[in-house]
């Protein structure tokens, strides 16, 4: 690189100044200047060498960077060519995949049509099979219902017999327990009497011992009181003698006090005269003191009222916090009670509906059974009358047969009455349940019309719970 022109101008100026200074300087000064100039020259040479090295380094770095840049540009051109080739290959692959997708869609459509036809055929076969199975299940269901009705009747007979046996066992156990209770009562009454006698004897002994102890204590107290009375009597006798001596000395003191009183009255008159002179400033000072006392009292009152107000404020804040906490607790309890009420109401509706269905179904079954038994009885009576008229039996045999038939009829009538009683009992329970349900709805403030259906009320009596009266 070429040297800069500014440096030459500065050097020419320095040389001109130096020549001007040399003309008017001595030898020593010139030697000193020569030394300084040599030092500056050495520094400048070092600086020039350093700058030359830096310039060489920069040129070397620039050459290396230029070479790297050309290499990177060549790599970039190669990458661009590779990208173009890859793009062309990618387009070709996309076309191939599109063609494959078309073939797959066509095959998939064919598979869907075949599967749809197979599925429709299988569905039709399954529907036929399910219809057949549904018919078989309907028959089985009807047979099971008939068996269930028969089992219910048999269970009711068994339950009736078990209730009778249970009642007998209960009466027997009650009698046994009553006898045991009587025995235990008599036994413990004897024990109580013996204990009462023992306690009475022990009480009398303890009372006698207590009376003896109290009598000895009373005698000791009387002796102590007598000794104390004698001591007090002697004490007061001594006091009276001492008081007489004291009265004499006091009389002498009174005379001396009278003399002093006269002297003091004279002195008081003089002091009163002096006090008249000092009364006016004293009254002013007393007024100021009274005013200050009033201010102090007002300050104390204000301080006390402030403390009381702070205490009331703290108490009110505590009460507000307690009330807020109670309000939060009550609101949570109210929401909980509301949810419980809704749950109970839902359960109550479900139970009412289930009981209504069960009672309705049971009453309908019992009524149908009673009707069927009545029809069967009428048919049996008609058949029996035909058989008897066709048989032409003798009167004795006919009487025995009639008696036997009457017994059978009586048994059947008893069964019919029991069934009618069960029907009436179930109907009454159903009606009572409906009334309780309506009362609960009224209690919760829910109109009965919002129920959504009207409960079926049967025609039975409205007697007490558990009592069934024939309608």
Curated annotation (Swiss-Prot):
Its main location: cytoplasm. It is found in: Cytoplasm, Cytoskeleton; Cytoplasm, Cytoskeleton, Flagellum axoneme; Cytoplasm, Cytoskeleton, Flagellum basal body. Keywords: Cell projection, Cilium, Coiled coil, Cytoplasm, Cytoskeleton, Flagellum, Microtubule. InterPro entries: GAS8, GAS8_dom. Signal peptide: none annotated. Component of the nexin-dynein regulatory complex (N-DRC), a key regulator of ciliary/flagellar motility which maintains the alignment and integrity of the distal axoneme and regulates microtubule sliding in motile axonemes. Plays an important role in the assembly of the N-DRC linker. This is Dynein regulatory complex subunit 4. It comes from Chlamydomonas reinhardtii. The lineage of its organism: Eukaryota, Viridiplantae, Chlorophyta, core chlorophytes, Chlorophyceae. The gene is DRC4.
């Amino acid at each position: 690189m070429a040297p800069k022109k500014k440096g030459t101008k500065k050097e020419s100026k320095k040389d001109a100044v130096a020549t001007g200074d040399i003309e008017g300087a001595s030898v020593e000064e010139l030697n000193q200047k020569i030394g300084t100039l040599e030092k500056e020259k050495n520094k400048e040479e070092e600086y020039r060498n350093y700058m030359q090295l830096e310039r060489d380094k920069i040129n070397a770095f620039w050459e290396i960077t230029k070479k790297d840049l050309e290499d990177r540009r060549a790599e970039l051109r190669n990458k661009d060519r590779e990208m173009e080739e890859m793009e062309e290959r990618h387009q070709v692959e996309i076309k191939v995949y599109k063609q494959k997708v078309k073939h797959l869609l066509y095959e998939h459509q064919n598979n869907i049509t075949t599967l749809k036809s197979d599925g429709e055929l299988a569905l039709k076969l399954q529907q036929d099979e399910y219809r057949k199975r549904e018919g078989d299940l309907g028959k089985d269901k009807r047979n099971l219902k008939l068996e269930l009705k028969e089992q219910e009747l048999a269970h009711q007979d068994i339950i009736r017999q078990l209730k009778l046996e249970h009642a007998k066992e209960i009466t027997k156990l009650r009698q046994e327990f009553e006898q045991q209770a009587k025995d235990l009562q008599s036994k413990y009454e004897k024990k109580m009497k013996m204990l009462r006698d023992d306690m009475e004897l022990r009480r009398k002994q303890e009372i006698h011992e207590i009376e003896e102890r109290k009598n000895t204590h009373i005698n000791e107290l009387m002796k102590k009181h007598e000794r104390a009375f004698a001591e007090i009597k002697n004490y007061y006798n001594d006091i009276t003698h001492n008081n007489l001596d004291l009265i004499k000395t006091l009389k002498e003191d009174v005379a001396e006090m009278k003399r002093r009183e006269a002297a003091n009255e004279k002195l008081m008159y003089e002091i009163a005269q002096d006090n008249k002179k000092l009364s006016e400033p004293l009254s002013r000072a007393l007024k100021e003191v009274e005013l200050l006392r009033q201010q102090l009292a007002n300050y104390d009152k204000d301080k006390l009222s402030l403390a009381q107000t702070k205490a009331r404020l703290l108490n009110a804040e505590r009460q507000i916090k307690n009330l807020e906490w109670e309000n939060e607790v009550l609101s949570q309890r109210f929401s909980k009670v509301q949810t419980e009420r809704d749950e109970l109401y839902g359960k109550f509706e479900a139970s009412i509906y289930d009981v209504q269905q069960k009672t309705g179904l049971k009453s309908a079954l019992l009524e149908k059974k009673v009707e069927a038994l009545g029809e069967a009885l009428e048919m049996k009576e008609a058949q029996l009358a035909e058989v008897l008229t066709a048989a032409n039996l003798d009167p004795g045999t006919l009487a025995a047969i009639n008696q036997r038939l009457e017994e059978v009829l009586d048994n059947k009538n008893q069964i019919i009455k029991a069934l009618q009683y069960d029907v009436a009992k179930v109907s009454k329970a159903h009606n009572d349940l409906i009334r309780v349900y309506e009362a609960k709805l009224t209690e919760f403030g829910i109109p009965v019309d919002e129920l959504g259906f009207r409960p079926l009320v049967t025609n039975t009596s409205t007697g007490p719970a558990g009592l069934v009266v024939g309608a």
